[in-house]
């Protein structure tokens, strides 16, 4: 996996998870709100321990500086991760789905631009980034499919 030549902060949950998952996005914002006593933005209106990724996307839409900073970092990490996939596997399409990618679907073009900085140049020109048609229900639908498949073919 591609990494920058320096390390930012470390968290035992792992770099990608810390920056780019729904739980990680919420945790980074909670840390930032706690650390910035002067911050008076939208995310301060709720108990810090209850701030979720959903709140971060809502604050982003209202141009909250902490939400913007955290989500821009997530876009960078999603771009780097997808660049690794493109460079290693040379897919035709990357489908973005899951809980975070309901609201994060607005970033797909930005993720592609970030991936272009890191990916193998010929491969990245041949891949398409698209949102899942299943949105945040991909995991649920996949689990239902497996249950039905296993029940029918036992």
Task: Indicate where each model-derived feature is located.
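ATP-binding/phosphotransfer module of carbohydrate and carboxylate kinases, centering on a glycine-rich
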Residues: 5-154
């Amino acid at each position: 996996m591609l990494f920058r030549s320096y390390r930012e902060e470390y968290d035992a949950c792992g770099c990608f998870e810390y920056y780019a998952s729904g739980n990680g996005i919420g945790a980074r914002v909670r840390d930032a709100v706690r650390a910035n006593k002067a911050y008076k933005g939208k995310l301060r209106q709720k108990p810090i321990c209850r701030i979720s990724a959903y709140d971060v996307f809502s604050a982003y839409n209202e141009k909250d500086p902490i939400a913007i900073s955290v989500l821009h970092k997530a876009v960078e990490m999603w771009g780097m991760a997808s660049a690794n996939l493109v460079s290693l596997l040379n897919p035709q399409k990357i489908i973005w789905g899951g809980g975070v990618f309901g609201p994060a679907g607005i970033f797909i073009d930005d993720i592609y631009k970030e991936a272009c900085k890191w990916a193998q140049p010929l491969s990245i020109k041949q891949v398409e980034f698209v949102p899942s048609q299943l949105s945040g229900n991909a995991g649920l639908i996949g689990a239902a499919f497996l249950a039905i498949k296993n029940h029918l073919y036992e």
